[in-house]
Amino acid sequence: GIEPSDASKHIKQKRIKSINKFFCYKTSNEYLDKYEKPKIITITNVLAQIDNLNEFAKSLGNIIDEKSLIIIEFPYLLHMINRGLFDLIYHEHLSYFSLTPLKLLFEKFGIIMINFEKLDLGASGPAIRLFLAKKDSVYQTSNKVVKQIKYEKKWGIEKIKRYNTFEKITKEKISKIKKIIYLKY
């Protein structure tokens, strides 16, 4: 695998082949020079921290073949907004996602969404586990994905009104927290 953290040392001790670098196009080529195309790629709670999403998606498209499966878990924007989960937002996260923009991003690099699961408790709160594959693969996009993207549009994913509602909910929650703190002291 490809693992940029110190965890790669433990992986190598268990005789698992890995490259200790950040994932980018150059690293994907380095991987392919040494190993076969992967059957499964798992990416858990990393997507929000990636600063160059085009490079990331291009690299994924480069490293997979028609039998590869990509599994990405990330905090789901609609859950965060609907539930007012402002406490899940922090400085290391550069972006929060719904399926709609990710579909556009990955399709630019020949990758399709094939399915997803909603998780009430992912690595950092409510999340989506998204399954992706090469466009010309053995996989097809499920109706579930198509319906969810339609739902996101109907919900107003592209409308500022939804984000203003999140701001209002956040301010109300902060006000309640301040009242509780004031009553306690």
Q: What residue spans do the PLM features occupy?
A:
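Class I SAM-dependent methyltransferase SAM/SAH-binding core
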Residues: 1-27
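A conserved beta-strand element that flanks and buttresses the S-adenosyl-L-methionine
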Residues: 39-42
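Hydrophobic adenine-recognition pocket in adenosine-nucleotide-binding enzymes
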Residues: 46
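Flexible, glycine-/basic-rich loop-and-beta segments that form/coincide
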Residues: 122-173
